Amino acid sequence: MYNIFSAFAKASLPLAGAFNKKLKLGAQGRERTWNILDKKVKSSLPKIWVHAASLGEFEQVVPVLERINRKNYQVILTFFSPSGYENKKNSPLADVVCYLPLDAVSNVNKFIATVEPSLAIMVKYEFWPNYLNALRETDCKTILVSGVFRDKMSFNSWYGKWMTHSLESFDHFFLQNESSLQNLKKLGFTNASVSGDTRFDRASQLIERDSSIAELKSFIGNKKCLVIGSSWKEDIAIMKNWLNNNDQNKNYKIIIAPHEVAPSSIKQLCDSLDYHPIKWSSLQGCVINDLESASTLIIDSIGLLTKVYSYADLAYVGGAMGTKGLHNILEAATYGVPVIIGKNYEKFPEAGKLEDLGGLFSVKDALEFESMTNQLLEDDYLRDKTGMICGHWINSNTGATREIVNYLKTIDEKLILD
């Protein structure tokens, strides 16, 4: 049944793309995959296949990719979604970057025959049965990094139990937490360890780099700054009144870095406010007085958010007011600032943990957002205390990359850079 569905999905994807922009991007990208592989895969080096579903999962494997010795191995990086591929198709951390062909048997056989991986690294919960079965048949070493196994995953359901067999392809599971370890044991697997989330290693590295942006320093001046990162329309909806009021009294500086930066999305964001924020793309023509007097700056470009968070006194991380999924709270927390999020974060254990520690605050509506935001911006002691909790939390959870790298050295010492 699964193979029939996979074959149907392969055949219908181009048609579905006519009605959905992201599906269209994925369909067009997958049409180029075989060309990319034929041109760039080298037969002279052993191959490491790294697969991440999207941009968020890619960030989890970055610390591992940075340690791979590319003189001895060729790295083939694949993505399932456009958010990963379109943003990272020119990543310097891989030799080949492409979309992963759908998990149809014909695609799988062709992909494995072309790439011939000697090591496969999957991220978080990328479990494609046909690919995993093919890796086992070719004796390819396979690991999962930053893995998550929840109670309600399909492996535990009547319709998904058959997929458990494909997990036998993994030589080792590096898991984020103890609950994942226990859930995996219930499925009969013991070749696992709790290494933690590699994103903590990634986040801890951010404070060591130069994140200075002169324009942001001029914009903020000596006022406190709220950074709203990876926002969606559902996030902006609960803070719209607060933003409008702040523009009138100019108490704080606001930087909004929305998840979607297409011109139409930026226009929709600007139109939702009762005033005219300035945009990052317009700063070159902006005189210094306009920059200092503006209350809100919209980052209409990708790749700046982790630096922008370094200017925050308080951060709101988007995605959890709606159903898009909470974005990366670690990138904000590493700078030692408290974090506010929306109400739907059950699938993100890191948010629950930081909330329990007292560094993160969940709000369910506009009233709670306004109350929490005002309290944290006005109370210096509370803000410093909760921010310190965030910074300490990041520092005390690093080390996952080291454990993974040590394991990879047992496969081949030449695999890892000194």
Model segments located where?
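Active-site and donor-binding regions of nucleotide-sugar-utilizing enzymes
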Residues: 14, 18-209, 227, 231-233, ...
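Short hydrophobic/aromatic-enriched beta-strand-loop microsegments
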Residues: 95-101, 142-146, 191-197, 251-256, ...
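Short acidic active-site motifs
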Residues: 107, 131, 162, 265, ...
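Short acidic alpha-helix that forms the nucleotide-activated donor recognition element
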Residues: 107-114, 286-294, 302-313, 334
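C-terminal alpha-helical cap of glycosyltransferases
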Residues: 397-418
